[in-house]
């Protein structure tokens, strides 16, 4: 099997590491057998070479092997809303807000997230600020999903083997393969996904990685203004996997009867500001904050196969917010997590 040094040499020569070799290397990383220096060198080498679909798929396969799973038997309408982060947009937590709307409209949300890496606040940070207990055991996450329609999986609890790469990733401070693996490794095995990415090239790559990994219905999105969400300020590039086939296209807010907004109205400087945006959106306060949530929740409902199109998903999302169902879903989720954790 390939040695660490031979793999590094391969990246220096801009040659691909084959599937079985990548499986071997990633297992060495996840089991603590590879040195921090070599982890860093290999991660940077892959980044400079540009990671291939096969390399990413192999690495994600191993990360899934080492993950602590959430026991969910029924995966119908089970969807994850997450992003790679790293878009430096400093917006409020759009996908986290959208999950309450999507769940209220009939999706079952298995959200995989953590604390802030590049944003003002990560999904874990803002959920805690909303009063939720995020540190649940896998069986408790499954119970929360069954009771509230949402299960939040705090990434460090489900990927303990990532501790070997964590310090290296933090010290490097640049994007590597580890930044794009998280959204590919949902511990509940959600086969449906709305994933935002930080670069347009990743749209075609990530959707094809998920195709190889056996996902059911996926939308990988990149707002052409630089957001890792579906944007309200112009076009969004989408890679869609459905029925085993991949297609790429662009959408515009006007396609769904939504106005175009500047992104400045979505920016926040703190976790508390993000919480304020979430509450305003769920209270049906008109404006860009609510509308970007409706758009992304609509896409999540389409990815979850609850809605037959993004447009119909937006209509269902609008109804869930206007009726108060989305706000009630947030309250129910928070109460359920606190009861399960014993914090109520």
Swiss-Prot record:
Anthranilate 2 binds at residue 169. Its cofactor is Mg(2+). Pathway: Amino-acid biosynthesis; L-tryptophan biosynthesis; L-tryptophan from chorismate: step 2/5. Mg(2+) 2 binds at residues 228-229. 5-phospho-alpha-D-ribose 1-diphosphate binds at residues 83, 86-87, 91, 93-96, 111-119, 123. Pfam families: Glycos_trans_3N (PF02885), Glycos_transf_3 (PF00591). Mg(2+) 1 binds at residues 95, 229. One of its GO terms (cellular component) is cytosol. One of its GO terms (biological process) is L-tryptophan biosynthetic process. It catalyses: N-(5-phospho-beta-D-ribosyl)anthranilate + diphosphate = 5-phospho-alpha-D-ribose 1-diphosphate + anthranilate. Binds 2 magnesium ions per monomer. GO terms for molecular function: anthranilate phosphoribosyltransferase activity; magnesium ion binding. Its EC number is 2.4.2.18. Signal peptide: none annotated. PANTHER family: ANTHRANILATE PHOSPHORIBOSYLTRANSFERASE. Belongs to the anthranilate phosphoribosyltransferase family. Homodimer. Catalyzes the transfer of the phosphoribosyl group of 5-phosphorylribose-1-pyrophosphate (PRPP) to anthranilate to yield N-(5'-phosphoribosyl)-anthranilate (PRA). This is Anthranilate phosphoribosyltransferase.
């Amino acid at each position: 099997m390939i040695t660490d040094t031979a793999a590094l040499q391969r990246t220096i020569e801009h040659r691909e590491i084959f599937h079985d070799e990548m499986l071997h290397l990633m297992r060495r990383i996840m089991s603590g057998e590879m040195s921090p220096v070599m982890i860093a060198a290999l991660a940077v080498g892959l980044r400079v070479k540009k990671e291939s679909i096969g390399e990413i798929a192999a690495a994600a396969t191993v990360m899934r092997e080492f993950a602590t799973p959430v026991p969910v038997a029924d995966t119908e309408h089970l969807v994850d809303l997450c992003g790679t982060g790293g878009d430096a947009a400093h917006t409020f937590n759009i996908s986290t807000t959208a999950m309450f709307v999507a769940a209220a409209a009939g999706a079952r949300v298995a959200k995989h997230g953590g604390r802030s890496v590049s944003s003002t606040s990560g999904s874990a940070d803002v959920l805690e600020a909303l009063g939720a207990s995020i540190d649940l055991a896998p069986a408790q996450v499954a119970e929360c999903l069954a009771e509230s329609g949402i299960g939040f999986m705090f990434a460090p609890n489900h990927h303990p083997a990532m501790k070997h790469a964590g310090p290296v990733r933090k010290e490097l401070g640049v994007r590597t393969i580890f930044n794009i693996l998280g959204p590919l490794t949902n511990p509940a095995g959600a086969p449906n996904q709305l994933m935002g990415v930080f670069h347009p090239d990743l749209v075609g790559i990530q959707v094809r990685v998920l195709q190889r990994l056996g996902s059911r219905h996926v939308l990988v999105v990149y707002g052409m203004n630089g957001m890792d969400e579906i944007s309200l300020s112009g076009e969004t590039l989408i890679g869609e996997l459905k029925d085993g086939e991949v297609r790429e296209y662009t959408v515009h807010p006007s396609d769904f009867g939504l106005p175009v907004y500047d992104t400045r109205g979505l920016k926040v400087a703190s976790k508390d500001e993000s919480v304020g945006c979430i509450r305003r959106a769920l209270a049906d306060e008109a404006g860009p904050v609510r509308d970007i949530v409706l758009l992304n929740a609509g896409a999540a409902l389409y990815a979850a196969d609850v809605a037959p199109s993004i447009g119909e998903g937006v209509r269902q999302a609008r109804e869930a917010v206007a009726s108060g169902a989305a706000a009630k879903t947030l309250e129910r989720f928070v109460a359920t997590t606190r009861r399960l954790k014993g914090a109520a």
